[in-house]
Amino acid sequence: MLSVIILAAGKGTRMHSSLPKTLHTLCGEPMLFYILETAFSISNDVHLILHHQQERIKEAVLERFKGVVFHTQIVEKYSGTGGAIMQEDKTPILTKHERILILNADMPLITKDALTPLLKSHNNAIGLLHLADPKGYGRVILENHQVRKIVEEKDANDEEKAIKSVNAGVYLFERKFLEKYLPKLHNQNAQKEYYLTDLTAFGINENEKIDAIFLEEEFFLGVNCQTERAKAEEIMLERLRKNAMDLGVVMQLPKSIYLEKGVSFKGECVLEQGVRLSGTCLIENAHIKAYSVIEESQIVNSSVGPFAHARPKSTICDSHVGNFVETKNAKLQGTKAGHLSYLGDCEIGKNTNVGAGVITCNYDGKKKHQTIIGENVFIGSDSQLVAPVTIGSNVLIGSGTTITKDIPSGFLSLSRTPQTNIENGYFKFFKKS
C-alpha cells in the first residue's frame, strides 16, 4: 500500500476568480474531486495540503469524502511544493505507509491507469512528460533513465530550456528518503520557495536511484487559468461521451452534446445534437431531441424535445414532452405535453393530454403551490391552472379556461367570457370621422 499527498494550498491567481482554483468545475464536478477519487482508488490514506481559503475547500470536500486527512501548509515559513509537505521541524507530514505518492490538485485528468507506470517503480521515481513545447514546465535532465537534475523554468539557462523532458508534477518517494533529505531543502532560488524537485539533487549526490517514468501527456494537464480549464473540460467531455457511447447511447453530432459526470444511462437512449444534460440525471430508454436541456431529472421510457427544458426534480416516465415545454419539480406519468407549456410543482397522471400554452400557475408571489392532475384528463389549449388546485380523473377542461377551484372526477370545466359578434363592427370601428 501507499499513502497519497495532494497539494492544494495555492491561490490560483491566474484563474481571476474568488472561487478557489481547485473548486472550479469540469463537467459539473470540482477539479479537486476528480483527483481525490483517483487517490482513494489506490490508497486508504489520503492527505490534502491546504492554505488559501482552506475552510471553504474543506467544507466542500467533507460533503463528499469522509476519509481525507487535512493539513495546513505553513506558507509564511515554508512556501512552495517542498514546504507543503513539511511540518514545523521540516520533517515530512505523518502518513500510514512508507511509500508516498505526491500529486497536484490542479491535475483533474489523472486516472489510476495513467499512474500505473509510476506505481510499478520499486525506487523513488518522478513522472515525466515529453513535450514539443515545454514552456512553463520544469526541465528534467536524465542519465541512463535516471534523473540527474530537475530545474524549474524560472531558474533554467538557455541550454536547459531547450530540453523537452519536463516534470509532470507527480512524485513517488519512500518515507525514509523524505525524512533524510526534506530537512536539507532550502529556498535559495528565484522564487524563494522550497521545491520538491530539489530533493533529487540531494539524492543524486548520495547515489540514490530516482527513476524517470514517462507518462501520457493528456492525463497530466495542469489547470492554472480559464483557458487550461476549458481545455481540460473538453478532454473530460470526450471521455464521458465515449463512455456513454460504449454503453450503446446514440449521439448525433457528439461534439455538440454536453453532459456532466453525474449523468447515467440505461437501456437504449438517443441524444440529438445540442443536448445538455447536467447534474445527477437518469436517462433510461429515452429519446432526447435536439437542443433540449435536462437538469437533475429522470427521463424514463419517454421522448423529450426538441427545445424542451426539464429543470431539477422533474420525473418524466412513459411520456412525451414536446418543443418549448418546461417542467420543474414535476412528475409526469403517461402524459402528453406537446408544446409551449410550463408544468411546475405538479403531478400528472396517466393518459392525460396537456394542450399548447397550458400553464400551472405555481407561484403566488410569496410561496410555491402544487397542482395535482388525475388520469384521463384533457386540458384544452391556453388554460391556466392556478395552484393550489386538484383536478380529478376523467376531466375535460375547455380551451382558454382559468381553473382556480378543484374539479371533481368526471366533470367538464369551462370559464370563458361569452363571445360577442357585432355586425358591421369592423366598418364602424374604422369609420372615417
From Swiss-Prot:
* Region feature Pyrophosphorylase, mapped onto this chain: 1-226
Quick one: where's region Linker? 227-247
Q: Which Pfam families match?
A: Hexapep (PF00132), NTP_transf_3 (PF12804)
* Catalytic site positions: H339
Give, as one word, the top-level EC class: transferase
Listed SUPFAM superfamilies: Nucleotide-diphospho-sugar transferases (SSF53448), Trimeric LpxA-like enzymes (SSF51161)
Pathway assigned in UniProt? Nucleotide-sugar biosynthesis; UDP-N-acetyl-alpha-D-glucosamine biosynthesis; N-acetyl-alpha-D-glucosamine 1-phosphate from alpha-D-glucosamine 6-phosphate (route II): step 2/2; Nucleotide-sugar biosynthesis; UDP-N-acetyl-alpha-D-glucosamine biosynthesis; UDP-N-acetyl-alpha-D-glucosamine from N-acetyl-alpha-D-glucosamine 1-phosphate: step 1/1; Bacterial outer membrane biogenesis; LPS lipid A biosynthesis
For this entry, list what GO says about its biological process. cell morphogenesis; cell wall organization; lipid A biosynthetic process; peptidoglycan biosynthetic process; regulation of cell shape; UDP-N-acetylglucosamine biosynthetic process
Task: Provide the binding site for Mg(2+).
Answer: D106, N224
Binding of acetyl-CoA, residues: A356, N362, Y363, S381, S399, R416
Catalysed conversion reaction:
alpha-D-glucosamine 1-phosphate + acetyl-CoA = N-acetyl-alpha-D-glucosamine 1-phosphate + CoA + H(+); N-acetyl-alpha-D-glucosamine 1-phosphate + UTP + H(+) = UDP-N-acetyl-alpha-D-glucosamine + diphosphate
A GO molecular function annotation here is: glucosamine-1-phosphate N-acetyltransferase activity
Instruction: Briefly state the protein's biological role.
Output: Catalyzes the last two sequential reactions in the de novo biosynthetic pathway for UDP-N-acetylglucosamine (UDP-GlcNAc). The C-terminal domain catalyzes the transfer of acetyl group from acetyl coenzyme A to glucosamine-1-phosphate (GlcN-1-P) to produce N-acetylglucosamine-1-phosphate (GlcNAc-1-P), which is converted into UDP-GlcNAc by the transfer of uridine 5-monophosphate (from uridine 5-triphosphate), a reaction catalyzed by the N-terminal domain.
The text of the family note is: In the N-terminal section; belongs to the N-acetylglucosamine-1-phosphate uridyltransferase family. In the C-terminal section; belongs to the transferase hexapeptide repeat family.
- The name under which this protein is listed is Bifunctional protein GlmU
